[in-house]
Each structure stands twice: as C-alpha cells, then as structure tokens.
C-alpha cells in the first residue's frame, strides 16, 4: 500500500512556463535560473557497464510561485492568493515558477550519488523533496524495464520511523506534458507533469492549468491542500523504506499513461472513496515484515540497515523477451559482498518470495484486502506501464494522511496482534508528522550507483562460503552530444569457495535459445522460471 505523497515545502508552490501575452498558460519566472545537478548512472550488458551522464530536477511543486509582474506570492502556506488565482485558468496566466533553490533544499549530488535531506532551513523551511532523473535539460530519462533488472545502492541508516525514502517509477510524459498540453511551457526542465497511482490532488498545476478550483487547505499540513483535479498514472514502487521496514509494490492503472481526474472519481488517498478511481492505490506489496519474516530487515538484521546495501529488482516476462507480458517481479539484495535473496513468505496460504498474479491473489485473500490489483490489470497492467517507458523518481517524505503506519507500524491502528497483514514493522502507532519533523530534522537518504541492464548484469556477489575478487578497467568514448558522456567499464569477476563448475548463484542456467552453462556451482540448483529462463537458486 502506498500512502499520501503530500510532500511539504513551507513557503512556496508551483510556477509554470512563460508566454509573452495574457492567454492561459503555465508561466516561467525570471527571478531564479533553473539548473540541474549532475548525476551519473550506468547501462549494463552481460560483460560491461556504460556510464551515462544525467542530471536531476526538483518537482515543480517545490519552487516558489509568484506573479508574472513581480514577486508577489501566488501561493503562501497552503492557500492561493484570491486576486491572482480566482480560478484555474486565470491563475495559470498570472503566476510563474522559477528555478528551485537547491541550497535551500540541500539536495546534493556527487558522481553517481544523490543525497536528500529531510528538514532544511535557509530563507525558508522545507520538508522533504521529490526529484526526477533527466536525459537532458528538457527531457526526463525513460527506462524500459521488461525482461531487465534495475539496481541501486541505498543508505537508510538515518531514516527513522515515520519517514519514507522512496525510489520508484511513474508513467509520466518525457517532456513533462508540454506536447500534450500547449499551455504548459515549463515542462521537464522545471519538473512538471507528475502523476502516480494515488491520482494526487495536492499538485498545484496539472495539464497546463492551475488546480485552484475547489482547493481545500489541509487541516494538518501547513503547506498542502487538495484541489478538484488529480493526476493519475501507473506506478512501480521499487523501494519505499526507512531503517525499519521496506516494500516493493506494483500499482497498475486502467490507462497506464498520465491522465487527469476530477473529484471523488480520482480515488486514492485524496478522495473519500479510495477505490473510486481508475488506478490501484494499494498495489501488491512485498514487505518482508508483513509477510512474517520479522528478522530479515532492520538494524542488525540479515539486511543490516546500519550500513549501505544494494537493491536488485528483476522484471521477468512470460516469453523471456522485452516485448512479453510481465509475469514476475523478483528481488535480491547485496551486502558485504554477499547476494541475499528475498525471504520466503511465512504467511499461511501465501508461499513464495516474488510478486506474481497468483501470489498477489493469495496475499489479498489471506489479509482480507480489497483486490484492486487484479481489478486494474494485475501484472499485465503493470507491464503495460513498463512497456511505455517510465520516469525515475527519487524522494524523501513524511505522511500527513496516514502517518506512514502502512509502511512500518500497525495498520489499521485498531487491528489486533493476530490480524493478518496488519503488522508491517516495529514502529509505534502514536507518532505524527509534526513530531517526526521536530525530532528528526537531520534525517536523510542517499541513493547511488544506479544501474539497469539484462537480467543478472548489474550486480555481483558470493555467498557466506565464497569469496570473489573484481578487476575493473575503464575507458572513455566520445559522443556527438556535448551534454552526455559515455564511459565503458569492463568488469571481470573471479570467484572461489564454491565447488564444481557451472553458473554462479543467481545466474541464468537455461531457457529457450540459451547457450551458456546449464549446471550450477554447488550447492545451487538450476531452477526453471519459465520456458525462456532458468536460474541458479
């Protein structure tokens, strides 16, 4: 389940792109230039990874919104200026968004690493942030993940209860919606076009217009509110986590790409009818603690959150190709040079350690949850979003809708200790966002070493009884683009400690057209996943 995405900023909101006349449009301001911090990532093949030079942009809900004729705020606290913004159309013409002041948000990058700080105070106070990976200054990077894997390193050691360092994909437009909605002149350069499976209604602008009509300020969030419109699209939550709990969760939608909804028909966190929309707001989540494995993840546990680790997510298809139907989502971890598989569920009636349609149906039945996942297309529905190509989101937030209890505590709060699926972590149910903000202002998350490529191409590691050595050589290659540099990194890994010959643990060992090894090093067994893919497990 995914909670509210009500990210906070204490004095500001959205401005959008410039037109030179008074027609309705999202305007671009001129008070602060928009610049994008550099962030590298890697594309991998079976034997090498190519480093790609990208950058990140902060979501357009963060920068201050002011009048096009001066510096008067269009949005202060959680309220629109009634003169500048009497309605959606007029507000879009009167107001503009400038570049984000990253020194105020204290979002920092270094090489392939991104750090997001929780509470920051400069000229104004900011809570959390949401960023997108860019291909170039005006286009989001799109990822096609079917029959691929996605890997990144994360440090959650400074994320306590009540916080969510979320890394995920959404099916938003690569240009931020500029082509579809000509009144949006800001686009991806300024972080516009966000959508997710909650169909968020707290966005200040959607589809080139303001979200003023029907705006109701939040009662418990001094920076946010809810408008008449929401922005929907398929969402693949690779990682929602703090140092106590984590979850991987696909959320399909009837229409995978970005669409605008109205009022209660949006469903999700922001509507009285949670299941009244066209997306699955709950998703099908694999949280190890919720699945009965309470000693797998956390400080000092199998995955020790006191230290950084690698997260690997694989997207298998029914025919082993990038054009097939999504059939399974697998999860691995690497920590201390050791590959660690996702734990097996211990819930009665729910077996396995990966997400499939049958696993999701069994989990929904065991927990008594509404099966919106199946209703909105299940794995095939999620795969349709992945086939579109999705934008990478990296964020840190707290939850003014349900206090993040759905991730790391007991939810619903009136559940008993024997209620199936209610226990999601060890955190207390009594905390509130304002307490989290005042108690842990220095919390932060670090994402780094992002890689994508064919299955088993982005990570290496042994087991407790094996050791490995890695030799890496690099060379730079020129490109025709002045904005992008590609570096080829060739990695050779030699392992010892496992007896016999064959494919290493977790590697491919069979499938239609497979020409590599068909046996596994001891003690692993070549296990068939489908006709096109077998793996050493």
From Swiss-Prot:
It comes from Penicillium janthinellum (Penicillium vitale). Glycans are attached at residues 136, 414, 456. GO terms for cellular component: extracellular region. This is Exoglucanase 1. One of its GO terms (molecular function) is cellulose binding. The active site is at 235 (nucleophile), 240 (proton donor). GO terms for biological process: cellulose catabolic process. Residues 458-503 are annotated as: Disordered. Coiled coil: none annotated. Disulfide bonds join 509-526, 520-536. Keywords: Carbohydrate metabolism, Cellulose degradation, Disulfide bond, Glycoprotein, Glycosidase, Hydrolase, Polysaccharide degradation, Secreted, Signal. Its EC number is 3.2.1.91. Residues 454-477 are annotated as: Linker. It catalyses: Hydrolysis of (1->4)-beta-D-glucosidic linkages in cellulose and cellotetraose, releasing cellobiose from the non-reducing ends of the chains. Residues 19-453 are annotated as: Catalytic.
